[in-house]
A protein has these predicted regions:
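Conserved pre-ATP/AMP-binding loop-to-beta segment of ANL
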Residues: 53-55, 169, 179-200, 206-207, ...
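ANL superfamily adenylate-forming
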Residues: 62, 142, 148-192, 207, ...
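Conserved AMP-binding/adenylation subdomain of ANL enzymes
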Residues: 219-236, 244-286, 301
Length: 560
């Protein structure tokens, strides 16, 4: 066992031992000193995996399953690392990884990490335009995807090497890796501060930001996420999340394997609450994490005869309504615990296991995460009973924080202004240290647990010849919490009609990823400030008031 492994294990075990003692954990926990060299895939995963035949990964789909032990994952990721090396992947190279929930995704992530290369996770929902932008801005020298997504790269230019999980003309086949000797690839050595991950995350007025994480910020920082989840050694952990997004790495990769738990994935083409409940029972899932959209769908199913092994249930991404929490508690005898974090960080705030849960609250700051609330105008710290922007105190060196937005000094200056990292989210603080989420300081919103940037959707909408201006806001929805609705100012000579709405919605559907789908349009003169900026806050308020009163707009049309 290396000194880095020993330090990491000691920190992990400290948090496991402080279960149900969050206040004490906040006071006592210290991030491990792993020294000048640290690689989580080698110093942690391989250390717990070699000779370990317990199940590390289970993927269930269409009645069949694929399983890998910890030892198999260690050996197979070595084979993939050797194969990647043969194709030129070296320390510092960026690899765009666009795979679904399949074993090769986990093996590739471990392998890329072992080589000191950079993982650029990408959703399979991304289209050619998104891919071209990511390859260019992320300086990706390699692309790894499944055969079904290969056609998306046909017109994506760039000097990148094409790698596929399967036989495709002109692309190297990753399956060839498994014919290679299971020997450890040469490890170049990685420092904790070396770049490990590049995530694209949406902003309000520009293209997605490029978030840079290191071999410390996520691999070590997710110790706090493990503490919030409550996952333990030997658990079976299921997280509902799509690959390519940070939450997938949080809860399908780092946190459960930090705890030495089994990662269980359930793939489905269409959500079926009854089928998911059956999997929870059959697989004896003990720890379950799902976005509010899934929880709202689950309570519409028969919750009787709940999963007997289920101990931890958590939700993240957006506030969860109390009725959902109450129904699950009544039927299953467990309480859904909320948490909060960002792509830019690990989990920051959470209701932790064996701690009192306050309805509507997302909990207290997690161990090692220096959360403060600052007044957005004055910058003063908010005390009990106050509210402010959720920030991290940079003077306390928050380890789980990104290095910054790569190649964007202006955004970095804004995000790190005044000695604090600014999340852009506002919360209220009570006298026991619990935080309750209020909303965003900007216009980004979530729909079905996907972060939506109005700017990205509006940029596509205004390409349509009938659209002069567009403003996208969240429209309340009982299942998805919100759906993207577009307020449209029509071009001269165009009249509001069902046919025009259909054409615009069709165009948007063809040019946006499925999760970005605009589901409603209204033809409306956009309210603006004196300087000409669209007042989305006014549109949001109007939307909420209409839905609350059940009032329909004259020129509103649905995509359904």
């Amino acid at each position: 066992m290396t000194s880095a492994t020993a330090a990491y294990r000691a920190a992990r075990d400290d948090l496991l031992g402080l279960r149900g003692q969050q206040v004490r954990a906040i006071d006592e926990f210290r991030w491990p000193d792993v020294g000048e060299q640290f690689n989580w895939a080698i110093d942690w995963f391989d250390a717990i995996a070699r000779g370990n035949n317990r199940t590390a990964l289970v993927i269930e789909e269409d009645g069949s399953s694929t399983e890998r032990s910890f030892d198999e994952m260690a050996r197979r990721s070595d084979q993939v690392a050797t194969w990647l090396t043969a194709h030129g992947v070296a320390k510092g190279d960026a690899v765009l990884v666009m795979l679904g929930n399949q074993v090769e995704l986990w093996e590739a992530m471990l392998a890329i990490m072992k080589l000191g290369a950079v993982i650029m996770p990408t959703s399979t929902a991304a289209g050619p335009g998104d891919l071209a932008d990511r390859i260019a801005r992320g300086n990706a020298g390699y692309v790894l995807c499944g055969p079904a997504d290969v056609p998306k790269f046909a017109d994506v230019t760039g000097e990148y090497i094409r790698l596929a999980v399967g036989a495709v003309d002109g692309w190297a086949d990753l399956h060839d890796a498994y014919d290679l000797p299971a020997e450890r690839a040469a490890h170049p050595g990685t420092a904790p501060g070396d770049t490990l991950l590049l995530y694209f995350t949406s902003g309000t007025t520009s293209k997605p930001k490029l978030v840079e994480h290191t071999h410390a910020s996520y691999p070590i920082g997710h110790l706090s996420t493990m503490y919030w989840l409550g996952v333990r050694p030997g658990d079976v952990h299921l997280n509902i999340s799509s690959p390519g997004w940070a939450k997938h790495a949080w809860s399908c990769f780092f946190a459960p394997w930090i705890a030495e738990a089994t990662v269980f994935l359930y793939n489905y083409s269409r959500f079926d609450a009854s089928a998911l409940l059956a999997q929870l029972r059959e697989r004896e899932v003990s720890s379950f994490c799902a976005p509010p959209t899934v929880w709202r769908m689950l309570i519409k199913a028969d919750l009787s005869g709940g999963p007997g092994a289920l101990r931890e249930v958590v939700s993240a991404g957006e506030p969860l309504n109390p009725e959902v929490i109450e129904q699950v508690r009544r039927h299953w005898g467990v309480t859904i615990r909320d948490g909060y974090g960002q792509t830019e960080t690990t989990a920051q705030v959470g209701n932790c296991p064996d701690e009192p849960v306050k309805p509507g609250s997302m909990g207290r700051p997690l161990p090692g995460v220096p959360v403060v609330l600052l007044d957005p105008v004055t910058g003063a710290r908010a005390g009990a009973g106050g509210e402010g922007e959720i920030c991290l105190d940079l003077s306390r060196h928050p380890l789980p924080l990104m290095t910054g937005y790569q190649g964007d000094s202006q955004r970095n200056d804004e995000a790190m202004a005044g000695g604090y990292y600014h999340t852009g989210d506002v919360a209220a603080l009570d006298d026991e240290g619990y935080l309750t989420y209020i909303g965003r300081t900007d216009d980004v919103f979530k729909a079905s647990d996907y972060k939506i940037s109005p700017f990205e959707l509006e940029s596509v909408l205004i390409e349509h010849p009938a659209v002069a201006e567009a403003a996208v806001v969240p429209a309340p929805d009982p299942i998805r919490l919100a759906i993207p609705k577009a307020y449209i100012a029509l071009a001269p000579g165009r009249e509001p009609s069902e046919q025009t709405a259909f054409e615009i919605l069709k165009y948007a559907r063809e040019h946006l990823a499925p999760y970005q789908r605009v589901r409603r349009v209204e033809f409306f003169e956009l309210p603006k400030t004196i300087s000409g900026k669209i007042r989305r806050v006014e549109l949001r308020a109007q939307e909420n008031a209409r839905r609350a009163s059940g009032t329909a707009a004259e020129h509103e049309y649905d995509a359904e």
